[in-house]
Amino acid sequence: MTIRIVIAGPRGRMGREAVALVQRTDHFELAAVIDRRYDGQNLADIDGFAGIDAPIYTDAVRCFTEVKPDVLIDLTTPEVGKRHAELALRYGVRPVIGTTGFTPEDIERLTELAETNEIGAIIAPNFAVGAVLMMKFARMAAKYFTDVEIIELHHDQKLDAPSGTALKTAQLIAEVRPSKKQGHPDEKETLAGARGAAYDGIPIHSVRLPGFVAHQEVIFGGEGQTLTIRHDSLDRRSFMSGVKLAVETVMHLHTLVYGLEHILE
């Protein structure tokens, strides 16, 4: 079965990778794209997309009603991703969203919308399979190492901090680790924020520098030993195998799934 796909933000770095993914996948069809510019034009007329025939829409609702795609891929920004996820579900399109910034209330509202309309949705803080495995391994380790800190490193154009992956990792660890304050009980910061932000007592540190793509290490400490679990995305192509899996899986869902780990076998 051919899956008809709309991609939001095709000119962005992640959007370009998503377009390339659809083009090289036999059972995927690029039905249209949503962009801030070039309404009514064709993607093939834009630099870097020669030969890729897809109408461009600036209005998501008009795109969904006229094109009637099966799936929306949105790897843009938190604000845009939230808006597109809700619109897609309201118009019978299955959203696959790779942006962060969704609150528990957002997830609850979108889950209700997906179940009301009996269609699937997938939201994942990270589509890199290696990153998902890192989170799984961190959760396993937290049963035995209760002292832990997270360091996430991203390019300097990332809009949110900490990353959705870091927050998701902390949430998974907190499920199996008793809440505790780490470090010396009388510890004081001589510079505000020196110990990072904290989720349920787990310090999270965010680094933003040119040259990075997406990286995270989870450092556990115990008596006489440490354990570090690290994942590095060296190229944005690292996310595409997870996007492909999500697009294929969402066609068979009737609810929202948050996190790629829930669809990995």
UniProtKB/Swiss-Prot annotation:
Q: Which Gene3D superfamilies match?
A: Dihydrodipicolinate Reductase, domain 2, NAD(P)-binding Rossmann-like Domain
Q: Which positions are annotated as binding NAD(+)? A: G9, P10, R11, G12, R13, M14, G98, T99, T100, A124, P125, N126, F127
What organism is listed for this UniProt entry? Geobacillus thermodenitrificans (strain NG80-2)
Reactions the enzyme catalyzes: (S)-2,3,4,5-tetrahydrodipicolinate + NAD(+) + H2O = (2S,4S)-4-hydroxy-2,3,4,5-tetrahydrodipicolinate + NADH + H(+); (S)-2,3,4,5-tetrahydrodipicolinate + NADP(+) + H2O = (2S,4S)-4-hydroxy-2,3,4,5-tetrahydrodipicolinate + NADPH + H(+)
A GO cellular component annotation here is: cytosol
In its UniProt entry, what is this protein called? 4-hydroxy-tetrahydrodipicolinate reductase
SUPFAM superfamilies per UniProt: Glyceraldehyde-3-phosphate dehydrogenase-like, C-terminal domain, NAD(P)-binding Rossmann-fold domains
Q: What is its EC number?
A: 1.17.1.8
**Active site positions, chain numbering:** H154, K158
**Binding, (S)-2,3,4,5-tetrahydrodipicolinate:** H155, G164, T165
Q: What is its main location?
A: cytoplasm
Which is a GO BP term held by this UniProt record? lysine biosynthetic process via diaminopimelate
Instruction: Provide the leader sequence positions.
Output: none
- Pfam families from the UniProt entry: DapB_C (PF05173), DapB_N (PF01113)
